[in-house]
Amino acid sequence: MFDIKAIRDDAGAFDAGLAKRGLAPQAARLIEIDERRRAIITSLQELQQRRNDASKQIGQAKAKKDDALAQSLMEEVASIKSAIQEGEEKERAANAEIEAALASIPNIPFDDVPVGPDESANVIRHSHGKAREMNFAPKEHFDLGEALGLMDFEAAAKMSGARFTVLKGQLARLERAIGNFMVDLHTTEFGYEEVAPPLMVRDDAMFGTAQLPKFEDDQFATFKGLARDDQEKYWLIPTAEVPLTNLVRESILSEEELPKRFTAYTACFRAEAGSAGRDTRGMIRQHQFSKVELVSITTPEKSREEHERMLSCAEEVLKRLDLHYRVMTLSTGDMGFASRKTYDIEVWLPGQNAFREISSCSVCGDFQARRMNARYRPKGEKNTRFVHTLNGSGLAVGRALVAVMENYQQADGSITVPTALQPYMGGQEVIAVHG
């Protein structure tokens, strides 16, 4: 969400920012809508002043026992009140129009974000490690999992349809171990506060982080009973970014409280609209998946620094697991709706012979904070400012499981457990067919 005053003050810069995303100019349209709104507000204020003046005159007329004038003024006040009610309705409609228009526009990229139409314009920032040498043809995770008898897509399809997985035995334990390892790392070494948030949220929470209204088709909604009453409607969270960021919704924090850093290990739910035909086998693109999320709330002066810190925290997970990865700076055409700059971490999957995204770390500026009305009061100042919000995967747990399986597979189909995860597996070193 944007400040319409800032758009009025520098319409050219606003449109130039949108142009980097390949979008047409919007400032003139927004300013026109706002001018209509401001004219309605001015007219309403004039009516309210007329009503107040006439009301005073009624008292004066009655004091002079001028009943005819008092009656005339009361009729005028009644007429003005009717006009005020109509004006208030117009004001509500005008406010809704400008808010809807502003809410439909994505965030403005930072100047150092590469400009391009899509992922082809993404830039490799750096890479870490090397791909493991294997003297056999590596398998993909779903072939490994099914051969172990610990990954059951058929059973999942019978009960839930496509894009679901049943994990069993030691693979289920390994996934849990990965998530617990991540949370422990982020809380004990990096200072994140663990949160166990709701997995169902209302419209306002989804609007606050900008999943709504633009990405409604990508979400799962649920209702109480069969009523389908919007008053009883909830959204299954597509990411713990939603509840974690909304922890500061409609709050005024002190500067001393910042930064706030939250982490959560949750299930996430996505409809994957528009993903037909992509990654139909395996765990890469699921309707339900587990993820460890990182969220930071900070000041405008510190948000760019916090972005780099968040990236390093996410990277450290892969370093501890000794996995080859690279970091991409996303182009303006590939970054998310609410982001001003995004880094993607892509892990190497030998079974696919490709890098695949396992984390996305974004700095959003005050874009989400304006939608949530999340503010802080700088030290020694009376006025408040909007906080800056950041979010990142730390990491996607299911994809981390895929990466461990494919990178630690052996020629006989067994999986070596990474050293960092062995304490979470009761010391187990290998997952084999009878493991």
Curated annotation (Swiss-Prot):
Free-text note on domains in this protein's UniProt record: Consists of two distinct domains, a catalytic core and a N-terminal extension that is involved in tRNA binding.
Subunit structure: Homodimer. The tRNA molecule binds across the dimer.
Subcellular location: Cytoplasm
Chain positions recorded as L-serine binding sites: 239-241, 293, 393
GO biological process terms, semicolon-separated: selenocysteine biosynthetic process; seryl-tRNA aminoacylation
Family: Belongs to the class-II aminoacyl-tRNA synthetase family. Type-1 seryl-tRNA synthetase subfamily.
UniProt-recorded name of the protein: Serine--tRNA ligase
GO terms of molecular function: ATP binding; serine-tRNA ligase activity
Domain of life, source organism: Bacteria
Task performed by this protein: Catalyzes the attachment of serine to tRNA(Ser). Is also able to aminoacylate tRNA(Sec) with serine, to form the misacylated tRNA L-seryl-tRNA(Sec), which will be further converted into selenocysteinyl-tRNA(Sec).
Disulfide bond positions: none
Keyword field: Aminoacyl-tRNA synthetase, ATP-binding, Cytoplasm, Ligase, Nucleotide-binding, Protein biosynthesis
InterPro entries membership: aa-tRNA-synt_IIb, aa-tRNA-synth_II, aa-tRNA-synth_II/BPL/LPL, Ser-tRNA-ligase_type_1, Ser-tRNA-synth_1_N, SerRS_1_N_sf, SerRS_core, tRNA-bd_arm
